[in-house]
Amino acid sequence: MIMSTSTVTLSTPIKTHNGDVSTIVLKEPKARSFFEHGEPFKMRVINEGERDRVEFDYNHKILAKFLTDMCGIDDMLLGGMSASDYFLVRNAATNLIVGVAGTDPLPA
């Protein structure tokens, strides 16, 4: 099995123990993250006639632990990201968790 990854380029680098980081590579999480941390979000499918849409209700404390598991950067350091960069990373992580993005995304 090939593990999916997603790379996010930050608009502002974050400071880590190994220097400034301007890209974050997220790896598909393992089941262990769910066992140890719980659910990072709840997903609701909302029927709107012919089209459905999906809403996410995030638990940001749990998602921070997932991000650490997925990229190897401590959540305290990830907390130094700008809000806009966090939203990019959060969206990339969400797509990896639900299986719709990465190096080998599922067919549409």
Predicted regions and their residues:
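Short, surface-exposed, charged amphipathic helix/loop patches that serve as local interaction elements
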Residues: 2-108
